[in-house]
């Protein structure tokens, strides 16, 4: 499934004293199976952009083409597009409303006019994907769960729609480290096992470096950087100029290099740093 964004522009409160251009002539192509991280300072246009991809917002100019269908046209059935493109908002647990977890997850599939058998199959699959045991949790109230578990239920409700593209807006916001790691692990598995296209909005450069295959940097409504994590995080000066940064481990490794250690400064994850440091220690041990 391909997504093409052509000359996309969106203006809030147009023709008023409070007019603000949130998206400014953005051009992108998202290919099937990519894991894209969308980063940028608050107000850079990230959330506005993803709401256009899902069809929740209409642009003032430009086009969004999903599988050769221009979704900005009035005659397009957006319900069909949203079957393909799922969106998980920030703090999605606040949108839970049913009396049981099973009913909450079933809400989306029921609106697809599926058979009861297919709905039950999707509920079980979605709960399994997010790490919730079906028999244990199906009849529980979602409001009895921890914050991390509520987040999983909310994500399962979108996953049960079986979208080809899953967009997540800060899915780990407000979670403790354990809950955060579990959610990210489940998102990684979705991408790996089902070849699902993932668009992840995140403020964590560490998570982005570890998970994404491509990084888009937004600033004042424009996409100013677009590339693999190694390419984007090498642009430290550009990132810092727009209020962002490279992963902390990158600064650490560059500092060690400045102090005379013979190491690569192009390190962006803890795992990469571990391998690089072990290589140095092993070389020193061999030379002793």
Swiss-Prot record:
The keyword Thylakoid belongs to this UniProt entry's keyword annotation: no
List of residues binding ATP: 40-47
Keyword ATP-binding appears in the UniProt entry: yes
Signal peptide span: none
Record key words, sorted: ATP-binding, Cell membrane, Membrane, Nucleotide-binding, Translocase, Transport
E.C. number: 7.-.-.-
Intracellular or extracellular location(s): Cell membrane
GO terms, molecular function: ATP binding; ATP hydrolysis activity; ATPase-coupled transmembrane transporter activity
Subcellular location, principal: membrane
Matches recorded under Pfam families: ABC_tran (PF00005)
SUPFAM superfamilies assigned to the protein according to its UniProt record, in alphabetical order: P-loop containing nucleoside triphosphate hydrolases
GO CC list: ATP-binding cassette (ABC) transporter complex
Membrane topology: Peripheral membrane protein
Every ABC transporter domain range: 3-245
Family note: Belongs to the ABC transporter superfamily. Energy-coupling factor EcfA family.
Role of this protein: ATP-binding (A) component of a common energy-coupling factor (ECF) ABC-transporter complex. Unlike classic ABC transporters this ECF transporter provides the energy necessary to transport a number of different substrates.
Subunit structure: Forms a stable energy-coupling factor (ECF) transporter complex composed of 2 membrane-embedded substrate-binding proteins (S component), 2 ATP-binding proteins (A component) and 2 transmembrane proteins (T component).
Protein name, per record: Energy-coupling factor transporter ATP-binding protein EcfA2
Lineage of the species this protein comes from: Bacteria, Bacillati, Bacillota, Clostridia, Eubacteriales
